[in-house]
Amino acid sequence: METIAKHRYARTSVQKARLVADLVRGKKVAQALEILTFTNKKAAALVKKVLESAIANAEHNDGADIDDLKVAKIFVDEGPSMKRVMPRAKGRADRILKRTSHITVVVSDR
């Protein structure tokens, strides 16, 4: 049984979040949680929260055994970018993109 959890509009860039997602793809959930706990990146905390949510969803909604679960799929898609302005010298301004991403985790007992 596959169970899904999503975090939409996460305030991290897709490029940074995908680095973390690649670490846990295909792993058992216990091992994935250990990896994320000791990964020193902001995106690791976001991915860990989504993974914990997926585990809770599997346990509550599907009655799955946590020991059998593994990370079947994990992917990070690009969300909308917030456009901000940073003042520069001589009256100019630069545009800053505050990027967001959609983190999706699918856990499965197969």
Curated annotation (Swiss-Prot):
PROSITE patterns: RIBOSOMAL_L22 (PS00464). GO terms for cellular component: cytosolic large ribosomal subunit. Keywords: Ribonucleoprotein, Ribosomal protein, RNA-binding, rRNA-binding. It comes from the Bacteria. InterPro entries: Ribosomal_uL22 (IPR001063), Ribosomal_uL22_bac/chlpt-type (IPR005727), Ribosomal_uL22_bac/org-type (IPR047867), Ribosomal_uL22_CS (IPR018260), Ribosomal_uL22_sf (IPR036394). Gene3D superfamilies: Ribosomal protein L22/L17 (3.90.470.10). One of its GO terms (biological process) is translation. The keyword rRNA-binding applies. Transmembrane segments: none annotated. The keyword S-adenosyl-L-methionine does not apply. It holds the Pfam family Ribosomal_L22. GO terms for molecular function: rRNA binding; structural constituent of ribosome. Belongs to the universal ribosomal protein uL22 family. Part of the 50S ribosomal subunit. This protein binds specifically to 23S rRNA; its binding is stimulated by other ribosomal proteins, e.g. L4, L17, and L20. It is important during the early stages of 50S assembly. It makes multiple contacts with different domains of the 23S rRNA in the assembled 50S subunit and ribosome. The globular domain of the protein is located near the polypeptide exit tunnel on the outside of the subunit, while an extended beta-hairpin is found that lines the wall of the exit tunnel in the center of the 70S ribosome. This is Large ribosomal subunit protein uL22. The lineage of its organism: Bacteria, Pseudomonadati, Pseudomonadota, Gammaproteobacteria, Pasteurellales.
